[in-house]
Design a protein with these regions (language model features):
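Solvent-exposed, acidic/polar segments of extracytosolic/periplasmic ligand-binding ectodomains
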Residues: 382-444
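C-terminal segment of N-terminal export signals and the immediately downstream linker at the start
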Residues: 34-59
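Beta-alpha junction/loop-to-helix N-cap segments that form part of ligand/metal-binding clefts
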Residues: 41-49, 68-73, 87-166, 238-245, ...
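Extracellular/periplasmic periplasmic-binding protein-like sensory domains
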Residues: 276-352, 364, 422, 426-443
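N-terminal secretory signal peptides
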Residues: 1-17, 26-33
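Extracytoplasmic ligand/sensor domains, especially the bilobed periplasmic-binding protein
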Residues: 124-235, 285-310
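Extracytoplasmic "Venus flytrap"
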Residues: 57-80, 102-109, 131-132, 207-216, ...
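Short, charged, surface-exposed loops that flank catalytic or proteolytic processing sites
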Residues: 363-376
Length: 444
């Protein structure tokens, strides 16, 4: 048995079982095997006086309000550690790779603290961060200040870029920090292709919080929806942790909002949605983002969770494969379910994609311990991942790759399923290569 080091109580996985369930054995990726052929490059030799080991930091929320985003971390980290077990070969030199994973606790201050510890005490060569602005933005800021290359994901890119001080006119606001994620354009595409599948009055009640994500969505998605012919009813920003939404619910009822859209933390949505049902607000479409991403979040709502519309940044239906592990999206989802007994969740894809990008960046330079060179390599990286092909330099700015997000719905699972709910894709406007399963059904 191989216990995962640091970063919370992950439990254990048997490596042979992991290789079998993930399909890695077929790809020849064993701990005793040679270094990954895909990670070999013909760069110049390094000085033998310096350590030939690399440290990769990984920060995600394992506890706190966003803990569901970290649910699959143990599985992904073990896949990455197994694939990197023989090290990375660069210019004829083999570098052993250590992954140092840390819990940001869904808290900006703690996320900044663990990032600074990884930078200053552990002296990581590359940082990875994922899941919500509360975790990702402070980690990215710490790396930018320290000159440590960082790749992050699962924060709408506008929240990451503008929330950290980037300006619309800047084509490259940051030197060391890079990001891949969906943005407002992808949400707009998803919503305007998903919502017309149900007959509505096109009046949208929105509940957008007073945080970096909510403010970015308010400034950008709201006007786009209006331009697309929707009437947006916005009762104003609310504070995370609000426990009484009566005034907002009354506003939505008075305006006869057939559509409801929100970007809250999970606990806030649970409070709002229960109060909405109790107070008689029953929209035809309830569109969630930031929450309603994971089965556990929706199952916790009971019957009122069935039929919620959501948005997927990855599912096992994505026709893409990890370049590091050679595991397909379907096998990634199946392997997780076989190894853990839990239902697949969206975070599997982008979390593994971080390690695809990390391996590609570290092997794209002659000296993987040259932080400036690694950062420059990320800026022109082109790598295959479970979420699709990531190509920096072709995005909305030089720091960002915009990735798809697709609209879908939580449905009761078919008879005989191991799990009570299933997320089905209903539109694919941001990536037509991903198959659609069905059409959106109204809540009422």
């Amino acid at each position: 048995m191989s216990k995962l080091p640091r970063g919370g109580n992950h439990g254990t996985y048997d490596r042979r079982q992991l290789l079998r369930t993930a399909g890695l054995a077929a790809a020849g990726l064993t701990l005793s095997g040679p270094a990954l052929a895909a990670c070999q490059v013909g760069a110049g030799a390094r000085s033998s006086t310096r350590s030939r080991s690399l440290k990769i930091g990984f920060v995600s929320p394992r506890t706190g309000p966003a803990a569901a985003f970290g649910e699959s971390d143990a599985y992904v980290l073990e896949l990455a550690r197994t694939a990197l077990g023989s090290g990375l070969t660069v210019g004829g030199n083999t570098y052993q790779v250590e992954i140092l994973d840390r819990d940001g606790q869904s808290d900006p201050q703690h996320s900044a603290q663990v990032a600074n510890d990884l930078i200053n005490s552990d002296q990581v060569d590359l940082m990875l961060a994922t899941s919500t602005a509360e975790t990702v933005n402070p980690v990215s800021d710490a790396c930018e200040a320290a000159g440590v290359p960082c790749i992050s994901t699962v924060v709408p890119w506008e929240s990451w870029y503008f929330g950290r001080g980037g300006k619309p006119e800047q084509k490259k606001a940051f030197t060391y920090t890079y990001h891949f994620c969906f943005g407002v354009a992808e949400f707009h595409n998803a919503y305007t292709h998903l919502w017309p599948q149900v007959s509505t009055n096109r009046r949208v009640g929105v509940l957008w919080p007073n945080d970096s994500t909510g403010n970015a969505i308010r400034q950008t998605l709201g006007p786009l929806l209006t331009k697309s012919g929707y009437t947006v009813i916005d009762p104003g920003a609310y504070t995370d942790g609000t426990n009484d939404y009566s005034s907002q619910i009354a506003r939505f009822k008075a305006a006869r909002c057939d559509i409801f859209s929100t970007f809250p933390i999970p606990s806030d949505f649970a409070t709002f949605w229960r109060q909405a049902i109790q107070q008689g607000y029953h929209p035809k479409i309830a569109q969630t983002a930031k929450t309603g991403v994971f089965p556990s979040q929706v199952e916790s709502l009971g019957a009122i969770g069935v039929g919620l519309a959501g948005a997927a940044y990855w599912t096992p239906a994505f026709p893409y494969t990890s370049s590091l592990t050679k595991v397909s999206s379907k096998r990634l989802g199946d392997g997780y379910q076989e190894a853990t007994g839990k239902q697949w969740n969206q975070q599997l894809g982008p979390s593994l994609a971080l390690f695809d990008a990390a391996a590609a960046a570290l092997t794209a330079v002659s000296d993987p311990q040259d932080r400036q060179a690694v950062a420059q390599a990320i800026s022109r990286l082109d790598v295959e991942t479970p979420v699709g092909r990531l190509r920096w330099g072709n995005g909305p700015n030089a720091n960002v790759v915009a990735t798809p997000i697709l609209g879908g719905q939580w449905r009761a699972s078919a008879a005989g399923s191991k799990f009570p709910l299933d997320f089905v894709l209903c539109e694919n406007s941001s990536d037509p290569m991903v198959p659609v399963a069905t059409r959106l059904q109204p809540l009422r």
